Amino acid sequence: MVLIDAASDGAYVSAVLDLMESSGDVQARHGVFQFRSIGACRNWHVENVSSEYTNSVVIAHRSSALKTFRLLTAGINPDVEVGSALTQRTQFSEIARVQGEGTYLGDDGVRYSVAVQTEAIPNVGDAWGALGAALDRLWRDGASTVGSPSAAASCCDLCSPDAVQRLGATIGRLHLALASIDLPGFGRAPVTPDTLQGWRVRLADRAGGAVGRLDDALRRPGFLSDKAARLARLVIQAWPGLKSSLASGVWERDTADAAHSGCGDLIRCHGDLHLGQILQRPDGRFVVIDFEGEPLAPLAERRAPASPARDVAGMLRSFSYAAHSARLRATSCGLPADNAPDVLLHWERLARHWFLQGYFGEVDGADGHLWPALPEARQSLVCLFEIEKAFYEVDYEINNRPDWAAIPLSGILQVLERWGGDRT
């Protein structure tokens, strides 16, 4: 017996795209598969995509990509919902525009997303890979010859000030487009006291769970590296202060602009934004992909309106990961790194500034309600979601890559320092 991945087979892809082109239905035993087109592509050939995707993705011809969802959940997948809304209701062009979709409608009236067809974007890879390569060049070549990381980065493509600012501007335009969509499930919602409490409880739960797992990891000799173990102890020591700040409402008072201008609006966001979700075109422009949200989160949570600060925090954490992973390569590959680690961490600090400069340069001129007005309140909001993301990363690394646990642990301590999370 020979087993193949049918979702990558040419016959399957051709059949599905034919059905989308013709708006065809396929009757099943307890429901019907329905396929609809928004201008599909014909005369395709199939090319598999080799990458770490949750779902099956193939390129059909040069202008169309077909994604088949492996994990089916009742309801419309946000990748289809958000992608279709951006395609049909906005002028935002920095996405893979949706060309068709496939759903399963059960006899019980429940609908499931099974596939989505988008345009295939000519690209040179995702931003994670491109930035990693650029940072490696930075510490190999630039760090030893140029005193300033920003000057060294100017010749390193994606780690240059211009590129990072343009990436920030792209995400700013994405949020403006999402905020403009007037459809059920989109639009804006105010941040209420219940919203603030929900954020606080979510962070406390995630942080408390991660701290418990860190304590367990420290009891396993050799499980964590010496550096990670040292950082883990510092995070555990900082946890009571953070917990007290959350319980006393210090963070809420900081974030709410002292009740003058609120915490901005809630909108539909990307939900799982990081450098791996950004493609870079050959001309240097960026394209945002994969609006599914965190795959393991419940559908209702992925579809819920959120603060745009959550997406921004995801990007900032991704910059941190890129810099720290480059630092690991610099100190472990045997090449003369010298001051490379310091240069990379300095670059990360600069990249935060460049990204936020590009982002708010786009947003502030077009919408004064997405974010709090005061810089201090914005920083508190971003820090909240950064530290929540970092605790999520701690759990992931302990379970999958304990050698990388030092990266999110360092991030937690850095965010606490910026936020003043040791206050009571």
Where are these regions (language model features)?
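ATP/Mg2+ or Mg2+-diphosphate-binding catalytic cores
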Residues: 230, 333-334, 338, 342-376, ...
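Hydrophobic residue at the +6 position relative to the catalytic HRD Asp in the kinase catalytic loop
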Residues: 278-280
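A generic "structured core" feature
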Residues: 111, 224-230, 238, 245, ...
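An alpha-helical support segment within catalytic cores of ATP-dependent transferases
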Residues: 30-44, 210-268
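Conserved ATP-binding subdomain of kinase catalytic cores across diverse folds
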Residues: 1-212, 283-285, 289, 293-345, ...
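Structured alpha-helical bundle/scaffold domains in large eukaryotic membrane-trafficking regulators
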Residues: 183-186, 215, 219, 327-331, ...
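Acidic, serine/threonine- and proline-rich low-complexity regulatory regions
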Residues: 252-262, 297, 301, 366-381
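Conserved catalytic-loop position in the HRD/HxD motif
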Residues: 272
